[in-house]
Amino acid sequence: HVIANPVQQLYAKLGLIDAQGSIGIFTITPSEGAMIAADVASKAANINIGFVDRFNGSLLITGDVAAVEAAMQDVIYTLCTYMGFAPTNVTKT
């Protein structure tokens, strides 16, 4: 999911102290997919890794809307094409 224009308070609540711009949210099963997604996303676009949890598969990325969306699409493409993950649609608010 992409949060295109989060309120400032949300960054603090998520522990994203120096973050700005959009937030991209992943929850990936199996959880090691989050580590792969973080690597792919960071190489796909000018984003920052806000949080990655290798135990529950959570990944938060931040950056401008276009970069976050591009990174998310590249992650989905990579996981589905090369690793057999089921595709999903990226939602946005």
Predicted segments, located by residue:
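C-terminal binding/interaction regions
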Residues: 43-48, 54-93
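Short glycine-/aliphatic-rich beta-strand segments at the starts of folded cytosolic domains
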Residues: 10-29
